[in-house]
Every structure is written in structure tokens, then in C-alpha cells.
Amino acid sequence: MMLKVIQQPHFVGERVIALGSFDGVHRGHESLLRTAKRLSGETGAPLRICTFNRHPLEVLTPDKPPEMLSSIPEKARRMAFLEADEIELIPFDRQMADMEPEQFLETLRSMVKVKAIVAGWNYSFGRKGRGNAELLTEDGKKHGYQVEIVPPAKTAEGTVISSSLIRQMLSDGQAEQAAQLLGYSYTMTGTVHSPKAAKGENVLDIQMWKRKALPADGTYSCLLETGTQTHGAMLHTCATLQPGSFKRAEIYLLNDRTEEIGRKVRVTLVSLIRKSEGLAGKQLREKLLEDREQARKMFDMA
């Protein structure tokens, strides 16, 4: 399904609106979007997801911008899978940060005829986060649209599913646990960057978005998707690979194939093989070859 991405909105008529940051588009977000999709079906109005074009903390705390589970293209891909019709990227700047919540809602209403708004239980908006579920509900009553506040999604143990918890799991190397909360295996998209690929070696240097949350330093079994083909591989993440303007990781191929420099690839995390042991030089290279053989066994390629 194709998702329409809107960056310069104009009045388009009736819409059901889903509000949120949707980082990672995890199981909690999925619950919210399915509620919004149900309302879209009931009202006949298309579903528009309204989210900011960047995380508010990029503006509010520019020295400490947060790592993200998903870039805008990754987010849009997942939302299309969940059958959203449109995603509107609202520019977030200092002026937006200082906007009163009532004005924010007025701006939304000026762009569409709102049939319903769906938001999460802890969604806040407007100056100092003053906008909340109560204010949304009052605005809906005043202007004649339906409001649904979606309760938190929880694990079987009762833990609230959140983007921050998933980031924490990834930072501890818990790939499989993070996948359970996401509802899918964590993915990273990037570009083949290293000349190693041109030399026919079985190691690819992948360059990724600088804000992308990577799993803890170590090695992981993964799937490497290039176009229409998917192959088992091994991911190696290490702090020494990270320059300032982008993030990098190494992909150890498990067969004799290679990839061209500049090719777009998609890496899907499967499971942790080994956390970093602080090795370097020859010891690290030998250990990585051992890890590669372990990955081959995981994919039954030994």
C-alpha cells in the first residue's frame, strides 16, 4: 500500500487524525493506529497521521538530540503496512514549541474537517506540554468531533510498552526482547560505503543515519536485504566505527557474494551472538571470524 507523505498541507476535507511521535511504530502505536483505522472505516474519512518532522528534543535540547528507532522513511514504511492513508510531517521549530495547545488544535482544524482524533494515553502537545487527553476531549466536544484516548499496551508481565524501553533493550543487546515489544524485528537501512566491497571481500561497511539507534556493541545474526533478495549475515557494531556525521556498522556476509558501493540495503536484527569484549587488532579479527561461523550455524549454513 502506498502512503501519501504530506509536507505542505492544504485543506482537503474530512479526516480521522492520529497524533503521536510514533518512533519505532511499536505495538502500542499499532494499537492506536488500528483504533484510528476503525474510526476511519466507520466515518468514511481517510486516516491521516500527524507527527512532527523531527523529534521535539532536537529543538529543545539541541546538544543532546535523542537516538531514534526509526527515520521518517522507516516510519512511513511501517505505517503503510498498517494501512494508514496519509502522514503529515508538521515542522517542529521554536515557534511550534511555544505554541499554545489550543492554537495547535485550531491549526489542525484549519487544514481538515476533523471527524475524530485518536491519541495515546500520555500524549502531550503545545507549550510546555500543557495539552493532554482532557484538553483534547474538551476541544472535541466544543467543535463536534470524536476523541478516543488509547490506553497503554503492555507486556504479559504488565510492563508498559514504550519507545524508550525498546531503546534501552537495544542498548543492552536484547534484540529478541526488543522485537517482542516492536511487534517485528528491529531494522536498519543504510548504504554500502566501504571499499572492502569493491575488493570482493566478505565484509561490507554500511553507512546509516547519524541519529539511528544501534544495538549494543557486539555481533548479531541478521538478515541483509538488497532489492528483492534476502540473505543471512552477521552484524558487527562497535563505537570505534562511529564518526560524527553518520553511523556505521560492518556486515559480514556468510557466502561468496558481495555488494556494490552505494547500494541501498536493509538490515534486520535477529539475535545477539556476543557482546563486545573490548578486543582489538588480531584478537578481534580472529574473534569476529569465530562469530561469523556461529552465525552460519544459526542459519544452518555450516
Where are the regions that the model predicts?
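Contiguous mid-protein beta-loop-alpha structural module that forms a pocket-lining wall or clamp
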Residues: 90, 94-177
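Glycine-rich, highly charged phosphate/nucleotide-binding loops
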Residues: 67-75, 98-105
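Phosphate/ribose-recognition catalytic cores of enzymes acting on nucleotide-derived substrates
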Residues: 193-302
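A glycine-rich helix N-cap at a beta->alpha junction
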Residues: 74-88
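Residue-level signal for inorganic ion chemistry
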Residues: 26, 79, 117, 178, ...
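Glycine-rich, Lys/Arg-enriched anion-binding loops that position phosphate/diphosphate groups
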Residues: 140-236
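N-terminal catalytic cores of NTP/NDP-binding nucleotidyl/phosphoryl-transfer enzymes
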Residues: 8-71
